[in-house]
Amino acid sequence: MKTFTLPASVLFCFLLLIRGLGAAPPGRSDVYPPPLGSEHNGQVAEDAVSRPKDDSVPEVRAARNSEPQDQGELFQGVDPRALAAVLLQALDRPASPPAVPAGSQQGTPEEAAEALLTESVRSQTHSLPASEIQASAVAPPRPQTQDNDPEADDRSEELEALASLLQELRDFSPSNAKRQQETAAAETETRTHTLTRVNLESPGPERVWRASWGEFQARVPERAPLPPSVPSQFQARMSENVPLPETHQFGEGVSSPKTHLGETLTPLSKAYQSLSAPFPKVRRLEGSFLGGSEAGERLLQQGLAQVEAGRRQAEATRQAAAQEERLADLASDLLLQYLLQGGARQRDLGGRGLQETQQERENEREEEAEQERRGGGEDEVGEEDEEAAEAEAEAEEAERARQNALLFAEEEDGEAGAEDKRSQEEAPGHRRKDAEGTEEGGEEDDDDEEMDPQTIDSLIELSTKLHLPADDVVSIIEEVEEKRKRKKNAPPEPVPPPRAAPAPTHVRSPQPPPPAPARDELPDWNEVLPPWDREEDEVFPPGPYHPFPNYIRPRTLQPPASSRRRHFHHALPPARHHPDLEAQARRAQEEADAEERRLQEQEELENYIEHVLLHRP
């Protein structure tokens, strides 16, 4: 077998080297087939994973790759070192082949080598690192036979000679240095600037594809980081379940499944460089689903919250405007109804002017509008609360309308020299009454009966704010003037006499009782030491200052009050004091003063209400 295998292998190796010296390095894209679709990429990845299952037998691989191929384009872009390693493996495989006829021994090694080379070009020639290829070329794997015979030693020597010859031919090539530099740069770029992406729907080796790190940063948004758990899970699955082709072929030469996984997928990454349309869209969608979901949800929630807040604010503004307009219409209706029914019969308001009342009314309206605006943001308000608020608003409007009606009669006495803007529209009866009044009393009442122009202007402005038309304002003014004239010509009303003030009920303090009659005078010599002059009922028990009953008091000790009171009875109050009577008298005096003040305040309030606010005929 050695005689037939070695010359054919050497010639075939020389032929391959001559054809592959001018091939482009594996890093160039012009050698590869036309761009592939996503389906073809997945199929290639699946073939790359499922191939180790049935590549252990050379005959099966030769049967799978028996399609006719062009010899000129078969090994373009193939690294010579990879071809040398494959040839060495092919030389090693026929060491223990099955028994075949002698006539067909010459063609069998060539067909097996060609099948192995074809399969290696498709699956793994680009993925073998240079260091492993060189190591396998320098130190080829041990033969499968366990016999330590001289034939095995001769074959190993021949293999070493063939490896050295291939190395010399490779060094002799003129374009070898350039190809080595480009290959090293391509491998460095592939190993350092690639990132493995995994499809989340079906994580597995058939869905893995590699992309440039620069393109990944340019296309994937910043808020869409890759999930850290997916690569680790994928690597664990690959290390546990899927064996790699390099592991079956080179045995101990492979360092780790992770390294050969990246090297196996290198053709996919190079093929992806020529694809421009499908993959960026998928990556953009995948990036948006990976990291942009949370950001999108946050943005959506913020937008919905802003829309809801704007809607609530618009609804509150609309409700406040509608409530304000409704209250204004209600106030104008109440004012007009009150004026037409004779509310102008009231008299002056005791010094309160029209401008102050109008300003107070505007302030109250602004406060109500502010309160309604604050409460407008609530969506649900009870009907009872609304009815109570409406009733309260109506009561307030009625009270203000009553006060405004009283203002119409404020200028009853008027000021001299004032001219009415509507003096030309007065009735002729009014002029006749003025003439009769002039003949009888010799006094002119035109100025008294006419309203002040400033008052009319203020009334017009107030009615405008109450949403009343100009015709209604004119009719109201005419009604007020006619009622004032009729009331002016009416007989004077009898003024009720003022109520007499109640007589003050002062509680006087009780008079002190008369002094007690003087007792018998004691001799003068008894004034110094009068201890026997004490009264019978005055007994001083021993206390803290009298520890001993027989204590002799000094002469500086003052006599008791009863002893002193005997000699000055005409100027001092009686001997017996009654504190309870004095306290009762003091309390009675305070109660009388409080009652008097209360009556005075009540009388003043009644006088103010009767003569100033609510004076009725």
UniProtKB/Swiss-Prot annotation:
<feature type="compositionally biased region" description="Low complexity">
    <location>
        <begin position="182"/>
        <end position="192"/>
    </location>
</feature>
<dbReference type="GO" id="GO:0050804">
    <property type="term" value="P:modulation of chemical synaptic transmission"/>
</dbReference>
<dbReference type="GO" id="GO:0031410">
    <property type="term" value="C:cytoplasmic vesicle"/>
</dbReference>
<feature type="region of interest" description="Disordered">
    <location>
        <begin position="348"/>
        <end position="603"/>
    </location>
</feature>
<dbReference type="GO" id="GO:0043025">
    <property type="term" value="C:neuronal cell body"/>
</dbReference>
<feature type="compositionally biased region" description="Basic and acidic residues">
    <location>
        <begin position="577"/>
        <end position="601"/>
    </location>
</feature>
<protein>
    <recommendedName>
        <fullName>Neurosecretory protein VGF</fullName>
    </recommendedName>
</protein>
<dbReference type="GO" id="GO:0051591">
    <property type="term" value="P:response to cAMP"/>
</dbReference>
<feature type="region of interest" description="Disordered">
    <location>
        <begin position="169"/>
        <end position="192"/>
    </location>
</feature>
<dbReference type="GO" id="GO:0042593">
    <property type="term" value="P:glucose homeostasis"/>
</dbReference>
<dbReference type="GO" id="GO:0030133">
    <property type="term" value="C:transport vesicle"/>
</dbReference>
<dbReference type="GO" id="GO:0030073">
    <property type="term" value="P:insulin secretion"/>
</dbReference>
<dbReference type="GO" id="GO:0032868">
    <property type="term" value="P:response to insulin"/>
</dbReference>
<dbReference type="GO" id="GO:0033500">
    <property type="term" value="P:carbohydrate homeostasis"/>
</dbReference>
<dbReference type="GO" id="GO:0048167">
    <property type="term" value="P:regulation of synaptic plasticity"/>
</dbReference>
<feature type="region of interest" description="Disordered">
    <location>
        <begin position="121"/>
        <end position="157"/>
    </location>
</feature>
<keyword id="KW-0597">Phosphoprotein</keyword>
<dbReference type="GO" id="GO:0008083">
    <property type="term" value="F:growth factor activity"/>
</dbReference>
<dbReference type="InterPro" id="IPR026128">
    <property type="entry name" value="VGF"/>
</dbReference>
<feature type="compositionally biased region" description="Pro residues">
    <location>
        <begin position="491"/>
        <end position="501"/>
    </location>
</feature>
<feature type="compositionally biased region" description="Acidic residues">
    <location>
        <begin position="148"/>
        <end position="157"/>
    </location>
</feature>
<feature type="compositionally biased region" description="Acidic residues">
    <location>
        <begin position="437"/>
        <end position="452"/>
    </location>
</feature>
<keyword id="KW-0732">Signal</keyword>
<keyword id="KW-0964">Secreted</keyword>
<keyword id="KW-0873">Pyrrolidone carboxylic acid</keyword>
<dbReference type="GO" id="GO:0030182">
    <property type="term" value="P:neuron differentiation"/>
</dbReference>
<dbReference type="GO" id="GO:0099538">
    <property type="term" value="P:synaptic signaling via neuropeptide"/>
</dbReference>
<dbReference type="GO" id="GO:0045202">
    <property type="term" value="C:synapse"/>
</dbReference>
<dbReference type="GO" id="GO:0019953">
    <property type="term" value="P:sexual reproduction"/>
</dbReference>
<dbReference type="GO" id="GO:0098978">
    <property type="term" value="C:glutamatergic synapse"/>
</dbReference>
<feature type="region of interest" description="Disordered">
    <location>
        <begin position="29"/>
        <end position="75"/>
    </location>
</feature>
<feature type="signal peptide">
    <location>
        <begin position="1"/>
        <end position="23"/>
    </location>
</feature>
<feature type="modified residue" description="Pyrrolidone carboxylic acid">
    <location>
        <position position="313"/>
    </location>
</feature>
<keyword id="KW-0165">Cleavage on pair of basic residues</keyword>
<feature type="compositionally biased region" description="Acidic residues">
    <location>
        <begin position="378"/>
        <end position="397"/>
    </location>
</feature>
<dbReference type="GO" id="GO:0006091">
    <property type="term" value="P:generation of precursor metabolites and energy"/>
</dbReference>
<keyword id="KW-0339">Growth factor</keyword>
<feature type="region of interest" description="Disordered">
    <location>
        <begin position="94"/>
        <end position="113"/>
    </location>
</feature>
<dbReference type="GO" id="GO:0005184">
    <property type="term" value="F:neuropeptide hormone activity"/>
</dbReference>
<dbReference type="GO" id="GO:0001541">
    <property type="term" value="P:ovarian follicle development"/>
</dbReference>
<dbReference type="GO" id="GO:0009409">
    <property type="term" value="P:response to cold"/>
</dbReference>
<feature type="compositionally biased region" description="Basic and acidic residues">
    <location>
        <begin position="48"/>
        <end position="64"/>
    </location>
</feature>
